[in-house]
Amino acid sequence: MVLSQEEPDSARGTSEAQPLGPAPTGAAPPPGPGPSDSPEAAVEKVEVELAGPATAEPHEPPEPPEGGWGWLVMLAAMWCNGSVFGIQNACGVLFVSMLETFGSKDDDKMVFKTAWVGSLSMGMIFFCCPIVSVFTDLFGCRKTAVVGAAVGFVGLMSSSFVSSIEPLYLTYGIIFACGCSFAYQPSLVILGHYFKKRLGLVNGIVTAGSSVFTILLPLLLRVLIDSVGLFYTLRVLCIFMFVLFLAGFTYRPLATSTKDKESGGSGSSLFSRKKFSPPKKIFNFAIFKVTAYAVWAVGIPLALFGYFVPYVHLMKHVNERFQDEKNKEVVLMCIGVTSGVGRLLFGRIADYVPGVKKVYLQVLSFFFIGLMSMMIPLCSIFGALIAVCLIMGLFDGCFISIMAPIAFELVGAQDVSQAIGFLLGFMSIPMTVGPPIAGLLRDKLGSYDVAFYLAGVPPLIGGAVLCFIPWIHSKKQREISKTTGKEKMEKMLENQNSLLSSSSGMFKKESDSII
C-alpha cells in the first residue's frame, strides 16, 4: 500500500511543478519526485534549448504584403529620392549661379570654394547615414524621415538669407544635407518591409524619382534664377521639402523593430533601455564579419571618388567649351532621362539575377561610368557630349537601383538598415573630396580636361574589386553549410546523451526512494 500512495504523490508533485518550467507545449513531463532535483533541472535545460526556435517565432517580422499600402509607401519614397537627389544632381545650375552671385574677379580660387558647397552637401547626406540607421532602428522609419525633412526645410530656408559663400557651408552643406540624410535612408529600408519578390522593380521605380527630378529641375531652376534670383529659388525649393515632410508619415511600420525586440512592445521602457545600451547594441559592427559585405563596403566608395565630378562641374565645362550653344542644361537632362530608364530596366533585370550575382551589374555600370567620364574632354562637338551623357546616365541608374537589393542579399533583412547606413557613410568621403579636387585642378590648369580624365580611373578600380564578391560569398556559404551540418549532428547526439543520462539518474533515484 505504501507503493500505491507514493506514486500519485510523485506524479502530483511533477504536475504542480510543470507550469514553473518553460517546457514547450506537447512535451512529456519529466518523471521524478520534484523540480528541485538536479536531474530534472538538466532535463528542463535541454528542453528549453530544444524549444528555442519556437519561442523566437513571435519576434520574426511578418511577410512583406507585396502591395496594398506599400504602393503609397513606394510613391512617398519616390518623392523622397526625387526631391533629395534631384536638387543635388541639379547643383551644377546652382553652382554657376553661386559663382555669379558671390564670385569676384580678384579671387582666383572661387571655383574651388564654391565646389565645396555642393560636394559637402552630397557628402554629408551619405556621411550621416550610419547615424541615421541607428535612429531608424530605435525610433522607426516614420519618425526619422519626418524629423529629417523638417531639418532639411530649415537648412534650405536659412540658405536663402546668406550674404556670402562661407555661410552656405553650414546652412546648405551641413544642416540641409543632414536633414536630407535623415529623410532619405529610411526610404530605402521601408521598402524591404513591404516588398520582397518585387523589391528590385520597386527600388528601380523609387530611385527613378531622382531621375525625373533631374530632368525637370535644371530647366525649372534656370527659369527661376533668371526670373527671381538665387535666393528666391532656394525658397521655392523649400516647397519640395515640405511635401517630403508630409510623405514621411506614410512609412507605417510592419517589421518588428529593435524597440519591440528589446522591450517586448512596451513603449514606456524603450527609451530607458536604449539610452544606456552599450555601443555594440547600437552600432552593429558584426556585419563587417561578413567578408563579402566588407569587400562591397570598400569597393563602392573606392569607385566613387570621381562619380560626383560631372554633376558639379559639367555645366561649367560646357559653358567654357561650347559658349555658343543654347540650352546647355540639356546635358544634365540627358543624364536624368537615361538614369531613370536605367533604374527601371536594371531594377527589373536584378529580380531575375540570383543572389549576390547582382553585383556583376554594378561592375558593368562602373566600367561604363569611368569610361564615359574620360570621354567628356574628348568631345569636340555638342552632340557627342550628349551621347556620352546618355550612356553615363543609363549605367548610373544601374548602380543606384540595385544597391538595396544587394545589401539584403549580403546581410539579410534584420541588419540591412545599418548595412546600408555604413555603406552610405563610407561613400561620403570620396563624394565630398572629388569635386573640390576637380575644381582645384581647373583653377591651376585652366581647364577641366585632366579633372575628367582622373575622375574616370576610380570607377574602373572599384569595379575590379567588386568582381570578387560573388566568389567570396559562395565560398563562405559552403563553409557555413558544412559547419552547420556538423554542429547540428553533434548537438543532436549531445542532447540525446544528456536526456538518457538524466533519465537513468532519475530512475535510479526513484528506485532508491522506493526501496
Swiss-Prot record:
Cellular compartment(s): Cell membrane; Basolateral cell membrane
Record topological domains on the Cytoplasmic side: 1-66, 136-144, 193-200, 250-291, 351, 418-419, 473-515
Primary localization: membrane
Comp. bias intervals (Pro residues): 27-36
Superkingdom assignment: Eukaryota
Gene Ontology annotations of biological process type: amino acid transport; aromatic amino acid transport; thyroid hormone generation; thyroid hormone transport; thyroid-stimulating hormone secretion
Post-translational modification: Not N-glycosylated.
InterPro entries, alphabetized: MFS (IPR011701), MFS_dom (IPR020846), MFS_trans_sf (IPR036259), Proton-linked_MCT (IPR050327)
Cellular component terms (Gene Ontology): basolateral plasma membrane; cell junction; intracellular membrane-bounded organelle; plasma membrane
SUPFAM superfamilies, alphabetized: MFS general substrate transporter
Tissue expression: Strongly expressed in kidney and skeletal muscle and at lower level in placenta and heart.
Compositional bias (Low complexity): 17-26
PTM-bearing positions, type Phosphoserine: 263, 498, 501, 503-504
Catalytic activity: 3,3',5-triiodo-L-thyronine(out) = 3,3',5-triiodo-L-thyronine(in); L-thyroxine(out) = L-thyroxine(in); L-tryptophan(in) = L-tryptophan(out); L-tyrosine(in) = L-tyrosine(out)
GO MF annotations, alphabetized: amino acid transmembrane transporter activity; aromatic amino acid transmembrane transporter activity; L-phenylalanine transmembrane transporter activity; L-tryptophan transmembrane transporter activity; L-tyrosine transmembrane transporter activity; thyroid hormone transmembrane transporter activity; transmembrane transporter activity
Biological role stated in the UniProt entry: Sodium- and proton-independent thyroid hormones and aromatic acids transporter. Mediates both uptake and efflux of 3,5,3'-triiodothyronine (T3) and 3,5,3',5'-tetraiodothyronine (T4) with high affinity, suggesting a role in the homeostasis of thyroid hormone levels. Responsible for low affinity bidirectional transport of the aromatic amino acids, such as phenylalanine, tyrosine, tryptophan and L-3,4-dihydroxyphenylalanine (L-dopa). Plays an important role in homeostasis of aromatic amino acids.
Family note: Belongs to the major facilitator superfamily. Monocarboxylate porter (TC 2.A.1.13) family.
Identification of the protein by name: Monocarboxylate transporter 10
Native organism: Homo sapiens (Human)
